[in-house]
Amino acid sequence: MDAEALRNLYLSSILPNESKTGNESPEKKFSSPVLLQRAKVIPLRLEYEERKLLHLLTAALDVSDYTDSVDTLSFSSPAKRLAQQLKGITAVLSGIMVAYDYKVGQELLEHKNFEQHAEFFKKIFEIGRRYKVLNPNRLGSTYGKLMYFVQDSMRPEIQDALGFNLFKPILTVYEFLNERDALNALEDPYAEIATMEIVAENRSRSAIQKDIKAKERAVEHIAKKYYSSKITKEKVRWCLYSIADSNSYLRYNRDPIAKLIGLVEAYFSPDTVDDEFTLAIDAINGSRLKHSHYKQYHYVVQSLHLWLLIMGEIFSLWALSDLELTNPDMEYKLIDNNQGIHRMQPCPNIRIAMERILRTAQEQSETWIGSSTIHLGDTAVPNALLFIDKYMQVPRILTPLVLLFKELDSLNDHSLLNYIDTAFGGREYLKKTILTDFMRFGFDGSGADNWFDAGSCIDGRLTSAWNWANNIHTKDYYRVLLMSGFLSFNGE
């Protein structure tokens, strides 16, 4: 499938406005025709042999200094940087092959016949990219090196030298089933049950067991009905399990946002102002916005609803990000944006997707507060990799907050409760204090080096929240967070 076909496929996976409310459960989002649509961007779960190749890839990239050596402004000419890129890529490919098959690796080192092993190298880099999508907290900086390797391999000069590039589309459930004429398995009436996530929270053991058995029966029904000479029962099950994985992924990303919206609506009203817990902010002390209590309340709630919609489309955004970074027609240039050297590259397809999502959020709001500017391919968000990384911070910031409130509700440590009563006037008072602080200073337009990159733009809303998270250690309630089990906002 060529790049244009992939682009259209990925963009078509984003649900039309009438299908979205932003509040449905992951299971409901994956009902019948929607399931088929979403499968276009859901990665297939890695198999055992693929995991062994993944370990090989990550080990090779971990010891590579590729990005440090090529992403620097010190090269005197493009030709010298190109030579360094080619040297770095061939070194890693050689290392991977030597570790995988010593004899073949020695031949590769001697004859430099990389093209003979093109499919192997494409496969191993596809495995790494596919794994990252379903495991965003894994790989760390290794993923950046991985993507920049693939990106640089798309350059005509490097393709000519190697005889191939490292890009292979991420293997999705849709593509896997489509190649085996088994897409109708996702239209089966039992598909929703077979792919649902079973959540144990606040449920009885008998109810959980009932769901487990119903899910197992549904999986077996579909596997028996749709297997053929082209696809085994086990492969059908594997596809269903992959979709179930994606349901868990969505719940992890979306639930903290939905729960925080519920907390905000429970503790605050836009029309009632408590002087002690007012949300009003002025453009002073780092803040770049000036909002009344009413305006700030709606600004925060709208931002949270926007993030909820973005997290609901995160698989589509991941797929488009992968496509943007490896697009040879969109050249990047190295820039220094005062946060290090970055590759700045246009992101037209992600922009289309984000504009659709933003339009949905605006249609769900009576009045949109703040800017509608989307930073992409500029100094604020230089490329698709940093775009995805930025929005994956949302659950990392909000999950510890939601868990803290849950921990406070169940807290029975008398010493800690006495401290909370003495220092903060009780646990409910403390919860409202933390929420007020988050809603005021996590959405005040702060956190960037200049007015253009901050403020109320779509990107700036998240910049402010991350700035608040980075300064959490300065808050009066920080020690309570630590005593309640809080560690950090880094996703661990």
Swiss-Prot record:
Chief location category: cytoplasm
Pfam family for this entry, one: DUF2009
Keyword Nucleus: yes
Tagged with keyword Protein biosynthesis: no
Cellular component terms (Gene Ontology): cytosol; nucleus
InterPro entries according to UniProt: DUF2009 (IPR018553)
Keywords: Cytoplasm, Nucleus
Subcellular localization: Cytoplasm; Nucleus
Family stated for the protein in its record: Belongs to the UPF0652 family.
The protein, known as: UPF0652 protein C22H10.08
